[in-house]
């Protein structure tokens, strides 16, 4: 409740600071990933072209993600969605990841599709025989590696000859390592640093796990 009461003040402060930075930088182009600034970025007078990038699907974000049969909530969802679309329509362009996703935005005429650009050559294709499971991503709450490690503690009891390798780096590394040790998984779950040949690591594994709490079309599955 306290966080909810403080939100209007924090949002006003965020908007003020955001606008100040743009006025000082005077960029030619401002690219937003369409979070809190979506409601006001098109109104800023810094002179830059405003472009939005939408990294998740429409129906898993914001008001569209609300699921309820309550008439009042349905009405609220419709109003929030109208405001959302109106804000998007005022941007110079809205960039999506796939043409399929573009089909969900029939109200907009300012869409562009730019797929994830990384194409990693596959020097080795998994034969499915290695008893290795791989996960890749930042060591951050979004990626859900804490949940994955908890789940792996159950898997390791039934399949002790399998090993989970999690490739990445981030501020949760020490916390995740402590979790691994606490669950007695030191030999069954390994935190590996980022590598340049991640495609080879996929080829050395039999199973890939995406444990994210929320995710767009991630580059780890591209």
Regions found by a protein language model. Name each.
Residues 100, 117:
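Carbohydrate-associated surface elements
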Residues 174, 196-205:
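Short acidic alpha-helix that forms the nucleotide-activated donor recognition element
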Residues 194, 213:
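Aromatic "clamp/platform" in nucleotide-sugar-dependent glycosyltransferases that forms part
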Residues 2-5, 52-79:
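Acceptor-binding helix/loop patch of EC 2.4 sugar-transfer enzymes
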Residues 16-20, 73-94:
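Membrane-proximal helix-turn-helix segments that form the acceptor-binding/catalytic region
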Residues 131, 135-154, 160, 171-177, ...:
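A conserved mid-protein helix/loop that constitutes part of the nucleotide-sugar donor-binding site
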Residues 32-37, 54:
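Short His-centered aromatic/hydrophobic patch
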């Amino acid at each position: 409740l306290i966080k909810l009461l403080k939100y209007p003040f924090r949002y006003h402060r965020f908007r003020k600071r955001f606008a100040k930075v743009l006025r000082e930088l005077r960029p030619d182009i401002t690219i937003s990933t369409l979070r809190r600034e979506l409601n006001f970025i098109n109104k800023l007078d810094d002179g830059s072209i405003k472009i939005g990038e939408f990294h998740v699907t429409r129906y898993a974000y914001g008001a569209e993600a609300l699921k309820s049969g309550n008439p009042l909530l349905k009405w609220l969802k419709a109003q929030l969605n109208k405001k959302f679309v109106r804000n998007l329509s005022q941007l110079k362009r809205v960039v999506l990841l796939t043409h399929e996703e573009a089909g969900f935005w029939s109200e907009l005429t300012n869409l562009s599709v730019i797929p994830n650009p990384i194409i990693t050559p596959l020097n080795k294709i998994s034969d499915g025989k290695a008893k290795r499971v791989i996960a890749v991503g930042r060591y951050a709450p979004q990626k859900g590696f804490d949940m994955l490690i908890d789940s792996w503690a159950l898997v390791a009891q039934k399949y002790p000859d399998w090993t989970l390798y999690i490739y990445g780096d981030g501020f949760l590394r020490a916390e995740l390592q402590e979790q691994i040790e606490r669950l007695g998984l030191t030999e069954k779950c390994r935190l590996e640093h980022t590598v340049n040949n991640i495609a080879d690591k996929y080829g050395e594994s039999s199973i890939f796990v995406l444990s994210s709490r929320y995710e767009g079309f991630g580059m780890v599955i591209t």
